[in-house]
């Protein structure tokens, strides 16, 4: 049976936004070309380990970014952290994209590129090793990263699932 996660309220967090990609799109019509912009935005509160992503489309770049931020605030995810890193290694898949997240010792930093780095820093992860495999499309890379983050379980959740205490693990 699937568990229902409660929706996180964006108002209770100090969210910082980060633009991952801006795409200029042209639609050819009878009278010429219509220009518009699409923005991919990641928002997060590093102190609360909350992160979300969204995309916005508009005729101007600032409006597209604003719409992306509003969209990102609607799908926030709580990230399970173990001190400054992630608790265990995970592999997120979306489309042809694969993103591997691996815990790292203190002082390593965020070893990630592009879209994955934006998600990790926004989520408050300070030490992690990542590898993005397959697609370079930032939309699919971010979605694969979020699939990986949703798989993270801390020691208490694992112990509860096995019917044991944390000390028994």
Swiss-Prot record:
One of its GO terms (molecular function) is rRNA binding. It comes from the Bacteria. The keyword Cell inner membrane does not apply. Residues 15-79 form the S5 DRBM domain. One of its GO terms (biological process) is translation. GO terms for cellular component: small ribosomal subunit. It holds the Pfam family Ribosomal_S5_C. InterPro entries: Ribosomal_Su5_D2-typ_SF, Ribosomal_uS5, Ribosomal_uS5_bac-type, Ribosomal_uS5_C, Ribosomal_uS5_N, Ribsml_uS5_D2-typ_fold_subgr. Keywords: Ribonucleoprotein, Ribosomal protein, RNA-binding, rRNA-binding. Part of the 30S ribosomal subunit. Contacts proteins S4 and S8. The N-terminal domain interacts with the head of the 30S subunit; the C-terminal domain interacts with the body and contacts protein S4. The interaction surface between S4 and S5 is involved in control of translational fidelity. With S4 and S12 plays an important role in translational accuracy. Located at the back of the 30S subunit body where it stabilizes the conformation of the head with respect to the body. Belongs to the universal ribosomal protein uS5 family. NCBIfam families: rpsE_bact (TIGR01021). This is Small ribosomal subunit protein uS5. The gene is rpsE.
């Amino acid at each position: 049976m699937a568990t229902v996660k409660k929706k996180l309220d964006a108002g209770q967090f100090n969210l910082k936004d980060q633009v991952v990609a801006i795409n200029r799109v042209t639609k050819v019509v009878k009278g010429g070309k219509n220009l518009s912009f699409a923005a991919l935005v990641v928002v997060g509160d590093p102190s609360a380990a909350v992160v979300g992503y969204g995309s916005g489309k508009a005729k101007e770049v600032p409006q597209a970014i604003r719409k992306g931020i509003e969209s990102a605030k609607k799908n926030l995810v709580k990230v399970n952290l173990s001190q400054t890193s992630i608790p265990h290694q995970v592999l997120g898949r979306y489309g042809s994209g694969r993103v591997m997240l691996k815990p790292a010792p203190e002082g390593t930093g965020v070893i990630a590129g592009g879209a994955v780095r934006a998600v990790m820093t926004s989520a408050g992860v300070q030490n992690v090793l990542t590898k993005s495999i397959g697609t370079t499309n930032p939309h699919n890379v971010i979605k694969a990263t979020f699939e990986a983050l949703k798989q993270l379980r801390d020691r208490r959740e694992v112990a509860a699932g096995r019917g044991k205490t944390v000390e028994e693990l």
